[in-house]
Amino acid sequence: MSELLLPPEHRYAKIIKEKLNEDGSELSILNLGPTHPATHGIFQNILLMDGERIVDAEPTIGYIHRAFEKIAENRPFYQITPLTDRMNYCSSPINNMAWWMTLEKLLDIEVPKRAQYLRVIVMELARITDHIICNSILGVDTGAYTGFLYVFQFREKIYEIYEEICGARLTTNMGRIGGFERDWSPKAFQLLNTFLEEFPIAWKEFENLFERNRIFIDRTVNVGAISAEKAMAYGFTGPNLRAAGIDYDVRVAEPYSSYEDFEFIIPVGKSGDTYDRFCVRNAEVWESLSIIRQALAKMPEGNVYHAEVPDYYLPPKEDVYHNMESLIYHFKIVMGEVPVPVAEIYHAVEGGNGELGFYLTTDGSRTPYRLHFRRPCFIYYQAYPEMIKGALLSDAIVILSSLNVIAGELDA
């Protein structure tokens, strides 16, 4: 019998017997993951199946748990940034900027306007990357591989822009307290302008491939739907909440990094199903492109970095090599020898897949007393078992893909 696949103490061993006693149906257990290629990460779901229909599901969280929050309690503030890269690595610059803004809020630091605009551009590029990956992979999971080939090359072009800005591609460790370590080169702006010219053509073709595709529509409409009330109750944010009809966006509700200077629409859906989540992300890509163009048009002159308060701002690298005072400050800041205020703060940004927040408690020492990452993927995965109950096994893969659950962010 299928209950032999589980230890006797597992709740499914009891559920199977109860279900058999209720209606006499033949139930089985299916392990989806943790290494199944369709899950796009180290996920496991123990599914209780009635034929091809999912009766119940139990997710297992923590396969790549790396104890980021505990590690952060033993690291100086500047050394926490690489941890943020490795959560949602599809849009790591957003994680970086969110962490710097949390520290700037703690230290009451005003960032130069030019640096704020450059941050907006970087974060919107990261959002586009995130949505390219999510929606193109959703196409692959429904059997439509062509769209993936149309747009995935542009992720590489965005990585080339990252590489020109900071030297890294995926885990960027970009920026610093107070702005950027250096102004962007002319080549970075050239690469950005080329991207803005070429990418919209490919993205329009991508939309046409899917939004008018009968097979794709049949696989996604009314699949994995969640109501606005349930989405709010679970704590959904980002595209998954907006697809359910709630027009909440952190960039508008609590503007940061001068987002109030830009005009953009918040796309919303109606039914909260897989198709709505796909369409909301498609529309958000167009809004991100608009924001980037506005930022370039309004780009102010000036510094990208506040260097006049050396206690918290890393000095320019060329000064570190030739100036003793700069070397001392560089060492003190990186090693965490600069005191910080005793405080308790929360700062959130609109990440690629929802509200990404840092809840920081300090005691005046060189490391955080406590740091909690608000990870949107962790919240979505709590709702996933309910969303796939009654669905077909093939739909479970599509629903997971549409939620854009990233294993690195889920487990942290």
Swiss-Prot record:
NCBIfam families: PRK06075.1 (NF004739). GO terms for cellular component: plasma membrane. PANTHER family: NADH DEHYDROGENASE [UBIQUINONE] IRON-SULFUR PROTEIN 2, MITOCHONDRIAL (PTHR11993:SF10), NADH-UBIQUINONE OXIDOREDUCTASE 49 KDA SUBUNIT (PTHR11993). It comes from the Bacteria. It catalyses: a quinone + NADH + 5 H(+)(in) = a quinol + NAD(+) + 4 H(+)(out). Belongs to the complex I 49 kDa subunit family. The keyword Lipid metabolism does not apply. It is a peripheral membrane protein. Coiled coil: none annotated. It is an enzyme of class 7 (translocase). The keyword Membrane applies. PROSITE patterns: COMPLEX1_49K (PS00535). NDH-1 shuttles electrons from NADH, via FMN and iron-sulfur (Fe-S) centers, to quinones in the respiratory chain. The immediate electron acceptor for the enzyme in this species is believed to be a menaquinone. Couples the redox reaction to proton translocation (for every two electrons transferred, four hydrogen ions are translocated across the cytoplasmic membrane), and thus conserves the redox energy in a proton gradient. GO terms for molecular function: NAD binding; NADH:ubiquinone reductase (non-electrogenic) activity; quinone binding. It is found in: Cell inner membrane. It holds the Pfam family Complex1_49kDa. Keywords: Cell inner membrane, Cell membrane, Membrane, NAD, Quinone, Translocase, Transport. Signal peptide: none annotated. InterPro entries: NADH_Q_OxRdtase_suD (IPR001135), NADH_UbQ_OxRdtase_49kDa_CS (IPR014029), NDH1_su_D/H (IPR022885), NiFe-Hase_large (IPR029014). Its EC number is 7.1.1.-. This is NADH-quinone oxidoreductase subunit D. NDH-1 is composed of 14 different subunits. Subunits NuoB, C, D, E, F, and G constitute the peripheral sector of the complex. Its main location: membrane.
